[in-house]
Amino acid sequence: RHRYYNGKHASEFVTVTGLTTFGIDTLPPIVSRGVLLDMAAHFGKPMLEAGTVFNSAEIKAAASAQNVRLEQGDVVLFHTGWLSLSETDPERFMAGEPGLGEDGARYLGELGVVAVGADTWGLDALPGDKADELFPAHQELLARQGVYVLENMDTRALVADGVQEFLFVLG
């Protein structure tokens, strides 16, 4: 409990001046196939509500409906429509969010994806499907699977252009 990547506890790498390891400054560039899953469209809404959780069943169904296949090495981005609230209703934007559940995170990690991101500030649904645990998808992806988490990804242009697969470049 309260462990990070490779089972490390924060006391092993967090100092008052920053991180001694696991810092974003140590991240190598990522160049990979990107896949955008439009979860808002999957649920038939322009924007998902806070607390809407998507897991492996919803991820598989959305990928199938979009006729895309998730593969090892992919960067998977989720469009929920939530990011638009950051401009129009910042208090609501920060009060909760739709997002990935632990089962969905485990599924993606076991596929061998490199990174998972969304147009939300924290990737996990809040409130989530596990009332006793905060950010279980983060824990699954980062600590157990070694998968990078990307937040506040602006997916609106990709959705507007009908893009589902693309070259993802970070770094």
Predicted regions and their residues:
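Active-/binding-site microenvironments in catalytic and ligand-binding cores
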Residues: 1-171
